[in-house]
Amino acid sequence: VKVFDDDINKLRIIQQVLGQGLFTSTFHPNVLHNAFRSADVVIGAMRYINTRHRYIIATDLVRTMKKGALVIDLRVSQGGCFETTCCLSREDPAVFEQYGVLHYCKLNISNRVARTTSMAYSNIFVPLLLSLGDAGSVQGMIK
């Protein structure tokens, strides 16, 4: 497993939580190229704050992947993480092959696994709500 992000602090936290054995890196072109070339599965889950600072995985990187490898775009409903998936519509098939690489791009994938999504949301929101309760108000929590 290799995790890429543009925020070094997030990458450090991921390593602290999951262990030093996990490979993390920023979006360095050479490192990405080597990772894509050897990957069996690539999952795109990048969240965009605004469209000016979008990072989209180029078609050239997808072309370097092994035949039969799989790309899963979890952000296709927000515009997609990959050039090869970003122009899909609801009528397009969820699974298709491009450049010998399988692509799974289903709008609202999290709706397909409602229980897992609910647990993930609980892991995010329960600590926030507990902190809010301890602080007494949103303003108190912000301070």
Residues covered by each model-derived region:
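Glycine-rich beta-alpha junction loops
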Residues: 7-10, 28-29, 47, 76-78, ...
